[in-house]
Amino acid sequence: MSKDKRKYSSEIVDGVEQAPSRAMLRAVGFESEDFAKPQVGIASTWSMVTPCNMHIDKLADAAANGANSVGSKPVIFNTITVSDGISMGTKGMRYSLVSREVIADSIETVVGGQGFDGLITLGGCDKNMPACVMAMARLNRPSIFVYGGSIKPGTNRTDIVSVFEAVGQHSEGSISDIELLDIESTAIPGPGSCGGMYTANTMASAIEALGMSLPNSSAQEAVSQAKLKDSHRAGEAIMNLISNDIKPRDIMTKEAFENAIAVVIALGGSTNAVLHLLGIAHEAKVDLSLDDFERIGKRTPVLADLRPSGNFLMSELIEIGGIVPLMKIMLEKELIDGNQITVTGKTIEANLNEYGHYPEDQTIVTKVDKPIKADSHLRILYGNLAPKGAVAKISGKEGLKFQGMAKVYNSEEDAMAGILSNKISAGDVLVIRYEGPRGAPGMREMLSPTSAIMGKGLGDKVAFLTDGRFSGGTHGFVVGHITPEAFDGGPIALIQDGDLISIDAETNQINLNLSEDDLARRKDSWVCPVKDEEGGVLDKYRSLVTSASEGAVTTKK
């Protein structure tokens, strides 16, 4: 086979001088004829750390079989994962966003070092998805992403968020120890990613809309023949990308990112999509900013009635056809650009033409002229509390404005203790700070406190502010990613208990009701609380990471 299809592997295996390389490869299963084939790296995030990833080894095998069937030589390798659901609410959660960078770095390292001509990545837990695609963008070799798939519902349509909210219900006394144990024991029935339009399903959908996975890859259950077939088809499809030299940056254009943003909004997806799409765009050399989310949000309605803000699970969306019919609706209404190329080698429009519409009697996805919300639930806020931006998730059910007195905590643990000891009341603005990319370090998610508030029945009566993140499972009046963060002396560091805070999702403003002079006086006397010297990867991350408004990345432009 020509060197054009073996642009990288030919340097590893061709010629007398590469006999040692070939000798090593023979030991891992290469035959003489395999050296003439394009080599395809298959990056598996298989792990028994989390149910999100416990089945991915089987999907990696299916992808390898597909790649074998079309004349390439697959090589499976592994990378790490961290479980958000397990580490949530603990110091371990500091490593979650850090793992995005470690995964991207490790995939880049193996592919660059081994000279693979193409790349298939498989991800399950939240940070896997952006990490895999960030690595693809950096390497810019023919690549496809395969989503590990969504989990089946638990008993009585429960999921992981049901368990987090049950903690608040238990604290409030509305459920017993036995009832809590029952929810804990039956909410997670097996493999797959968390079952609402939380971060994993949001990012899988965004990547499909971006063009980096096959149609409907985002909308299959983890344990299903459909997901095994999707993985096999990805293995088959990689050869077409190699043959035609279609690379990630050919696919991930500015217009493709705009498609991904629009689909995330239509699905009612996670705030984490903002952070992750900014990070992917950074690696793809695409100029994307918070203002693009605001601009696209003004013209894009929320159409899907999915958890956490809505009623339905991902498994129920899968039953009616996944996100492909949604994208058909959006294409017909000119809410996405159908001319963008995808990993099939065809345009989005050509891909969508092969699929039908939703059943007429379905109630999960609304019509464009009768949306759940006429514009985006993801609001980009600015003001004297967030001069460089913040990201709010406001479905409209909570109202569009909130004004209240601040209750300030300098860590998630302190805030959680305050909530469970009934120190938070209706009308409060709960501020959790020093949880940003540099402050935590690692920008922890605040699912434990928000779920506890929901469980106590205060979800529509309390607003949350943080320089950290919110889980895709969070709902309520929440504002995160506040920039500059407290660790860097941002205005959020200057808030005191009892300060009046105003949030307006109509004007996209977030303000502390103090004069510039008062803020300046507080800034003059501000001293950053002493943070532990963490050592290791957390210190490395703190020294490199950019702000949330820039995607919290660790590589230079």
Label every model-predicted segment:
Residues 96-105:
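Glycine-rich, highly charged phosphate/nucleotide-binding loops
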Residues 111-132, 144-147:
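A short, small-residue-rich loop immediately preceding and capping a beta-strand
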Residues 2-54, 59-78, 85-86, 91-96, ...:
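Catalytic or ion-coupling anion/metal-binding cores of large enzyme and transporter domains
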